């Protein structure tokens, strides 16, 4: 049951992506357009050069905010910088308990923590294929004693929260997107996360998503994420989403909405 609860969060990470629906790329939403999904953050095109996003479902237990800003083109690539901030402490302390909702042992009290991330994104259309390169730096600040035994050793989760134990990390990746028809698109990506010096210092992540666009205001997505990496207990790999009780992988359906304000 503990893993089921936390894999609901992982679903947000699995689908966690002037081009609409391109959260993963250097393209910004058009001004006054918003988009959101069951697991995706709410995104809003504030201006022609600035887009912001928040995860509304998690905001009150894990305050978060992201800002994407367009930059000058480089070698024909559309470029943008992205900055993220997250305060995970309230949620982590919520799950530091015994029983069904407990994932972290109750003897651990998580101190105030702040996560910062800065990324550089470059996108370009090549022969009908949208290519995006990204890379950046992650910083984790713990304002108090953070016990190293309190790590959550689960795929996707460990290497994202590990930055608070390691103080810093690096991420880089490649995204390839192609529309195979007017309404159907395919997204394939490969991402690497590094936590130099930490036990369990890397995670290699691959994702495949297929989307059906009913209109510019609604789409349905399904797919999987494959994770391979090092953890405190050794090497591991997993196909996600994963249902622990059934000991099986199942595809997950994501619904997304969008609208342009006049």
Region roles according to the model:
Residues 176:
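Cysteine-nucleophile amide-bond enzymes
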């Amino acid at each position: 049951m503990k893993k089921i609860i936390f894999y609901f969060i992982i679903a947000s990470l699995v689908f966690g992506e002037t081009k609409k629906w391109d959260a993963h790329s250097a393209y910004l939403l058009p001004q006054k357009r918003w988009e959101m999904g069951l697991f995706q953050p709410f995104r809003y095109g504030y201006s022609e050069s600035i887009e912001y996003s928040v995860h509304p479902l998690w905001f009150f237990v894990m305050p978060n905010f992201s800002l994407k800003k367009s930059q000058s083109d480089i070698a024909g690539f559309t470029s943008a910088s992205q900055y993220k901030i997250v305060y995970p402490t309230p949620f982590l302390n919520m799950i530091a308990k015994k029983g069904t909702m407990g994932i972290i042992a109750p003897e651990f009290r998580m101190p105030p923590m702040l996560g910062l991330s800065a990324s550089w994104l470059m996108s370009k259309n090549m022969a009908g294929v949208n290519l995006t390169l990204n890379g950046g730096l992650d910083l984790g600040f713990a304002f108090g004693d953070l016990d190293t035994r309190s790590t959550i050793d689960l795929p996707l989760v460990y290497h994202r929260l590990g930055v608070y134990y390691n103080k810093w990390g690096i991420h880089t990746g490649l995204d390839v997107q192609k529309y195979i028809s007017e309404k159907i698109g395919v997204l394939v990506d490969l991402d690497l996360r590094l936590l130099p010096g930490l036990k369990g210092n890397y995670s290699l992540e691959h994702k495949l998503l297929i989307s059906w666009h009913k209109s510019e205001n609604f789409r349905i997505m399904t797919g999987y994420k494959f994770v391979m990496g090092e953890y405190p207990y050794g090497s591991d790999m997993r196909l996600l989403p994963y249902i622990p009780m059934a000991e099986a992988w199942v595809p997950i359906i994501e619904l997304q909405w969008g609208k342009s304000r006049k």
